[in-house]
A protein has these predicted regions:
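N-terminal Sec-pathway targeting helices
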Residues: 1-13
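Bacterial N-terminal signal peptides
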Residues: 12-20
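Intrinsically disordered, low-complexity segments enriched in Ser/Pro/Gly/Ala and basic residues
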Residues: 19, 23, 56-59
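Sec-dependent signal peptide cleavage junction
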Residues: 22-31
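Surface-exposed amphipathic alpha-helical segments
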Residues: 32, 37-40, 153-186
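Conserved polar/disulfide-associated segments of primarily extracytoplasmic proteins
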Residues: 46-153, 157
Length: 186
């Protein structure tokens, strides 16, 4: 009984930390280098540890973000917990491991999102989800598909997220592949 009581708080702490990885602001010294997708608009708040672009014609968003330094969990712990969290939220389509770009690897999640506003509502207690979703114009609340990649370099965790309306997802995904392949974490 005592061990079960200890495991519950530990599990909650690890889950909160893993989810915070994706949605927290960062104040780190690490740097992300990437070739931005052509014909996409950069977020004016982009910096060396948080980069977001938006494409008006397809209402798509891609972002690369470094986790805060206090979230130094190994990827092999964070990945499965994020998988379970997304499954519990009912948005996980599939999960696998991926190798991409400049010797990068990580966990990849494909997500089915009924609409950006419902996603915002379901993650309302988590900071920084808006940095990706609020760039989608109001009134464009259609079903979206998403891809989330968690990766780790030199002990730092990073999240890469791509969101696009379902009808455009595959074609826009092909368009941004060179951007994914150009990502370097220093």
């Amino acid at each position: 009984m005592k061990n079960r009581l200890l495991n519950i708080p530990l599990g909650v702490v690890i889950l909160v930390a893993a989810v915070s990885l994706v949605f927290s602001p960062t104040f780190a010294n690490a740097e992300i280098k990437v070739t931005p997708p052509s014909n996409w608009h950069a977020n004016p708040d982009n910096n060396s540890t948080s980069l977001i672009w938006f494409q008006n014609s397809t209402k798509s968003v891609i972002g690369v973000k470094k986790a805060p330094d206090f979230l130094s969990f190994p990827l092999f712990l964070a990945g499965p917990f994020v998988t379970q969290f997304l499954a519990d939220k009912g948005v996980l389509e599939s999960a696998d491991q991926i190798y991409f770009g400049n010797s990068n690897s990580g966990y990849r999640y494909f997500l089915n999102l009924s609409s950006p506003s419902k996603l915002l509502d379901s993650f309302s207690g988590l900071p920084q989800i808006g940095s990706f979703l609020t760039t989608i114009p109001e009134g464009y609340d259609v079903p979206y598909k998403g891809m989330l990649i968690l990766t780790q370099k030199q002990g730092d965790l990073y999240a890469i997220i791509f969101l696009s309306p379902k009808e455009n997802f595959d074609s826009v995904m092909k368009e941004i592949q060179p951007t994914l392949d150009s990502i370097q974490f220093n």
